[in-house]
Amino acid sequence: LTSAVLTTTPSEPSAKPGELRSLGDFARGSGLQSLVIGISKDPTAKVTVLLVSPVSGRPVLAVKVPTTDVAARAVEAEERALLAIRQVAPRKVVDVIPRVVDAVEFEGRRATVVTAMPGIPMATSYIRRRHTATQALVAADFNAVETWLTELQSGTAGRSARVDMDGGVAARLRERFPDDVRFDADLDQLAEINDRLGRNETPRTAVHGDMWFGNVLLAGTQITGVVDWEASTTLGEPIRDLVRFALMYALFLDRRTRPQRRVAGHPGLRAVRWGAGVEFALDGVGWFPDLFRQFLERGLVRLGAPAASWRDAAVAGIAEVAALTDDHDFARRHFELFRRLCRAGHA
C-alpha cells in the first residue's frame, strides 16, 4: 500500500476539500501509522501528521493540516510552491525537497501530503549543549547551508536584476507600525540601505523565503531535507536566503545564558538584551563574527555583488523579518534591532 501511495498522481491544486479523500481514509489506506507533531497556535496554525512505517518506524509521509482559514491559504501556497520548485531546480536540490504526493480533506479544509524527509533538524543539534560554542560545529552548519544554497541558486539562476531586498517590506512595515512616531526616519534609513544595495545586480533565482536552521535537516554534515516552502518563489532575490540563515543562527546564540552573563564560547558577547547575538555578529570581534561575515561575503561575491555590502544586506534582512513574520512581538523586536544597528552603523 505504501508504494502505491507514493506513486499516485497528486490531486489537482484546484480540487476543493469536498472532492478529496478524508485524512482518516487516506491514513488507513496507506497502511502507515499516524503520529501528530508540531501543533502551533499562531494565525497560520498547522498540525503536522507524520505517517510512519510500522516496519522501520521511520516517517514516510507528512501531512500539513491547517487549523484556520489563514493557515489553509498557507498550506495551499506551499503545495503550489513545491510543485513549482521541482520544475526548475536541479536534481541535487530536488532530492532534498519534499514531493507532493496527494491532497486530503480535514474538517472542511485542504491538507497536503508530502514525502517525509530524512535526517535530524539542524535546530536539534543547535540547542545541544556547547554546539554553538564550538567553532568547528558552527562552521560545519554554515558550510552545509552554503553548499546547498550554491546548488539552488546556481541551478535556478535566470536574468540579472538590481538587488531588491525590499519586495514590499517598507509598505508592510508601514501597515504594521502605523503609530510609531519615529517610523519615517527609520524608513528613510532603510531606503538608503536598499539604494546602496540596488546599485548592484544579482541573478533572479529560486528563493526558499524562510531559510532558518529549523527548516534544515541533516545527516552528519550533509543536508538531507529543506522544508516549509510556503514563502518561496521560483524567481526572486537570492540574497534573502543568504542573510536569513545567518541572522537566525546569530539570534539565538545566547538562548542558554542568564541575563547579563557572558555567552559561552563567544568572548565579548553578553546576554544583555534581545538580539545581542545579531549585534555581536555584525559589530563584534571573534570567530563567530568572522564566520558570519565571511559566509555573507562569499555568498554575495558568488552572486555578483560586492563583499563590502554584507552589512547592508544583513540589516535589510532584519527589516524583512520585522515586516513579514506572523508574530507581532517578534516583528517589533526585530524592528527595534534594526534601529539599533542603523545607529551603530550610521546607515
Walk through the language-model features, giving the residues of each.
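Regulatory N- and C-terminal appendages and interdomain linkers associated
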Residues: 1-39, 313, 319-347
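An alpha-helical support segment within catalytic cores of ATP-dependent transferases
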Residues: 19-35, 157-208
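Active-site acidic catalytic loop and adjacent metal/ATP-binding pocket
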Residues: 38, 42, 46-52, 56-58, ...
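ATP-binding glycine-rich loop module of kinase domains
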Residues: 45-78, 134
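Conserved kinase catalytic-core helix
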Residues: 81-92, 96, 120-163, 187-201, ...
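Short beta-strand micro-motifs within the conserved protein kinase catalytic domain, predominantly
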Residues: 97-110
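Conserved short submotifs of the Hanks-type protein kinase catalytic core
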Residues: 108-121
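Active-site activation/catalytic loop segments of kinase-like enzymes and analogous catalytic loops
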Residues: 240-300, 317-329
